[in-house]
């Protein structure tokens, strides 16, 4: 729901979806909202709501990942107290019942193993079917992802985003029973990475490394 002028009245709205173009949590920090009041939605141009945290009633799930393992395509949670270089990531929510997500090696089109990240593929009635008027092979491939050794009748939409699924156990609501759930973590777009000697890198990580290597380098410079 997009409300351009109308002020937010808690008595009128049950759930509001906001695009995370800015730091929404910081913007509303003065309102002293509960950590479960603002929820993340993983949206994609080919599917407006792939996963969501709305109505999960739990605080964001945080993991700290080994950066060296990430470069090799592996997901290795670590203790941030013992590894100060660990990357903090936050979940994007659970997969809706009418959606199927597969984490796939984008080059071999085989399912990624447990402990690996890969391209996020989606199978859902909410997915777009095609780009209007496009006959480009690249566009056709995005809507017709087939998993090697999988069901050939099932076509997936290829998001071009990297991520992984992670299983956690959390109580639902205050005093609730622990429930096992699978949540999606989104790492970023494949087009925003580059490979050197078989290792994956994000430009932002390279820039941060350069900024930390000498005190005279200005952070956030252009």
Residue ranges and their predicted role:
Residues 1-86, 100-101, 107-110, 116, ...:
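Gly/Ser/Thr-rich phosphate-binding loop
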Residues 129-132, 207, 211:
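Amphipathic alpha-helical interaction motifs in eukaryotic regulatory proteins
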Residues 23-29, 147-149, 174-175, 220:
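Short helix/loop segment immediately N-terminal to the Walker
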């Amino acid at each position: 729901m997009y409300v351009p002028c109308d002020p937010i009245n808690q008595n009128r709205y049950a759930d509001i979806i906001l695009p995370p173009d800015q730091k929404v949590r910081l913007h509303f920090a003065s309102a002293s909202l509960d950590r479960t009041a603002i929820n993340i939605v993983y949206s994609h141009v080919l599917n407006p709501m792939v996963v969501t945290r709305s109505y999960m009633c739990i605080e964001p799930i945080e993991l700290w990942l080994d950066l060296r393992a990430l470069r090799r395509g592996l997901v290795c949670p670590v203790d941030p107290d013992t590894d100060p270089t660990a990357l903090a990531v936050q979940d994007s929510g659970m997969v809706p019942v009418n959606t199927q997500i597969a984490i796939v090696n984008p080059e071999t089109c085989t399912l990624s193993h447990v402990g690996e990240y890969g391209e996020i593929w989606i199978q859902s009635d909410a997915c777009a079917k095609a780009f209007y008027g496009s006959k480009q092979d690249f566009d056709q491939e995005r809507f017709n992802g087939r998993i090697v050794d999988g069901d050939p009748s099932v076509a997936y939409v290829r998001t071009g985003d990297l991520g992984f699924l992670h299983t956690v156990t959390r109580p639902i609501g205050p005093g609730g029973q622990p429930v096992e759930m699978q949540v999606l973590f989104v790492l970023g777009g494949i087009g925003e990475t580059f490979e050197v000697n078989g290792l994956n890198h994000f430009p932002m990580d390279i820039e941060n490394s350069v900024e930390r290597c000498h005190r005279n380098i200005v952070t956030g410079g252009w």
